[in-house]
Swiss-Prot record:
PROSITE patterns: BAR. Gene3D superfamilies: Arfaptin homology (AH) domain/BAR domain. Residues 18-238 form the BAR domain. This is Hydatid disease diagnostic antigen P-29. GO terms for cellular component: cytoplasm. SUPFAM superfamilies: BAR/IMD domain-like. Pfam families: BAR.
Amino acid sequence: MSGFDVTKTFNRFTQRAGELVNKNEKTSYPTRTSDLIHEIDQMKAWISKIITATEEFVDINIASKVADAFQKNKEKITTTDKLGTALEQVASQSEKAAPQLSKMLTEASDVHQRMATARKNFNSEVNTTFIEDLKNFLNTTLSEAQKAKTKLEEVRLDLDSDKTKLKNAKTAEQKAKWEAEVRKDESDFDRVHQESLTIFEKTCKEFDGLSVQLLDLIRAEKNYYEACAKECSMMLGE
């Protein structure tokens, strides 16, 4: 494994600084490459926004994550569980004062306990078939693309740094030296650019392919809400 190259790092820093003040020339990426990089740069924010909203939707938050760390075997208590428990408690306490209401409260409590089970199954399914897949995309495919982007920028800086040195060469010997370096840099840049472009294309294709995971989410919602509707219809005698 190559070690840290102080000289290259300094040259890249100097080249970038010169570009910021329009002192040094900068090799432009092809339009397609620039467009792909722009899209990839936005993907983390897009995916993170969806993950955060979905985790909130399925009752995953910082508190529940901490609770899971200490009580992995304990089922999470959902809001549906809490409502079912409240209905059950009031049913028991009001049986004498309101027998008909008490009976219906008991039935409603049972309905909510079954819906709570359906909710837990739904939450778990969404976590494994949607959230985890999005996180995996972030941590593997998108991470690889970001590394490729960094590598491409580094070889681009190396190329432009040596072009600047060639431009400022004072002697024939210096000019010959930097011409050779530039030729080598151009070869490296072309190779890394093609490798990076392949990774960028793959990343955008896989990002678009997350539509499959979105359908998994919608399907899980459909099944959950149908289960809840069925429980309610049974109690209503429909």
